[in-house]
Amino acid sequence: MKRLYLRKISALLMMCVLLITALAGCGKKAENVSDNAATEAPTATEEALTPTEAPAATEAAGPYYSADASVESVVTDAAGKGMVGNWGLGNEYEIQALLTKYNQPTTYLSQAFDMDGFDDDSILLASAMTYNELGLVKNSYDGGYGYGDGVKYIDMNDEGVAMLEDNIFTTGKFAKENPETVKAFIYASMKGWAYACANPDEAAQIVYKYGSSVSADHQAYMAGEVKKLVETDMTGAAVTNYGNMDDTAMQQTLDLAKKYIKLDDSAAADKLQTLTLDDIRDTSFFTAAAASDGKFTPEKKDVSIQLKWLPQAQFMGYYVALDKGYYSEAGLNVKIVPGGGDIGETTAVYTGQVDFGVTWVSNLIAAKAGGMDLVEVTQVYQRSGLVLVYKINK
Amino acid sequence: MKKLRSKFNRQTITTILYPVLFGVLIAVLWQTQLLHKIIGADTFTLPLPKRIFGIITDNWSNILINVRATVIVALGGLVLGSLFGYLLAIVATVFPKWGSGGLTIASAFNAIPIIAIAPILNNLTKDFSKDPNIRSMFAKMLVVMITCTVSMSINSYRGFTELKPFSLDLMESYAAKKTAIFFKLRVPNSIPYVFTALRISVPACVISALVSEYFAEYVIGVGRQIRENIVLAQYATAWAYIAIACGIGIVMYVILLIVEGVLLKGRR
């Protein structure tokens, strides 16, 4: 019995020793690794990052940027240091367009789905959605970083590199076979969005009720910001026709997509360059839904919609339409399928796992170029919600 | 003798021929789209081999950059992890009372999923270097190292301790010192076990390198390309990188088998 006890203690001791040696091992390896990596670096970054001198104005008062620094000086400095962050995976095109606008290489750091990289200064110019990450950075509620006025941001809409984001899409085949279902779904969804924008606080509560990935406070903040994206276009003008597909904004999105979506598959890359607005969107369903009296005879009653991300106020219109019974009034039985992580909403819709999906127009264009028969039927967000946030010197 | 050799040859021929024939059969079924009918896929999610091969040849220089990054991480992690594992086994042999128990606990490290440790190590190595490429490569190597350490330490510990019957008694009857026993008996005895460990570690190091790239700060590597292309619905390109990833694993395994065959000739 005593021996067993002894053995247990010695095992514990051994574990401590192992841990310590493991940690010591980590330190020792440092030299090897940097050797390897140093030789790798020049080839890995094709577009060599040539460090540029930070503008004097930004360096004078502290480690960050002065409150009145120009967009160009901030972008040039951060890109020169190689510290511009984005999530990648199809979210990077607006950032690359902005970097190109200021003659910078289009490489960026891979940003995690939190703002820790921005917080610990490994990313100077971090991507953020106005309705999500920007709120977390500024506010000090649960999960927030509490920077308040200590940060400023660069708006893609102001810079002329905005691309359209959240829309509603389906497959060309589904739209052709179930036109009434598509119209009914658009009608009820946009009715939900209209209500949500008129009552953002209530909409936030409804979303929270249906299973939220974030706190109630953040949900309320998000609803307020999402409302702005639905009600304002890229030029800042008010939009009353919710869900309208504006040709100018759509064309700008397509043009930027053609320039910045890089596809290794030559067949897909060629197809991307030939795409026109008519290939990616069909306005007929939206026009018909807007003109209708709200009575539909859907061909398929049980439909589902795949969200691009976790349940949050970004998708409040759908949750409101479900909660207020707008979908059932239109003769539909709707199931909302949350996304998250690496769920490809385009693939889910294309393979028929779900009938509708919410995605960014650029992702739809990439999928279309890859050979998926997808078509946008409504454009919910009228302007880009993507910003680049940076800290300012106090 | 002659009969034996011909028998041996026939055996090696069949062991190579059958898998190759099976592979060719699958490739033919795949290209003729019969495979798609059997498993109910379409040519979009499962593109034809010809198209995949075309993408590989079109983007060869770009692919090489990613392959290089992945191989450096995999090999670096494999070497570091194996050396560290061997060292742990030596420590465990020198202190036999703690040794076996300690190694059992160490093997618990093997149960940590790569997906869980990769982002954590990413955050822990933020201060390592100012260059994101270097620090993210370091983080990736640590992930690979953790997966390679355990199999090496457990296997080589067995090699150090499970000696041939009476060989230890013989050495002791010669009044051999402990160091002599260690270098003349234990170390040579551990070599086949080292290769057993490597047979596990080599495929594992490629897999963990690919997965760690998913979460790395710096966008590079075969694994990262697979993820990007699948999310962007570029399945043909994703399949091209999957094929490359398989190639890396197979080539490294074959190299290991050849080295093992040369070094352990006549020992097995």
Regions found by a protein language model. Give the residues of each.
Chain A
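Secondary-structure end/capping motifs
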Residues: 177-263
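Bacterial lipoprotein signal-peptidase II cleavage site
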Residues: 23-35
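Conserved C-terminal helix/tail region of periplasmic/extracytoplasmic solute-binding proteins
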Residues: 250-300
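Bacterial N-terminal signal peptides that target proteins for export
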Residues: 2-13
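Bacterial N-terminal signal peptides
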Residues: 13-22
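Pocket-lining segment of extracytoplasmic ligand-binding domains
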Residues: 111-213, 355, 362-363, 392
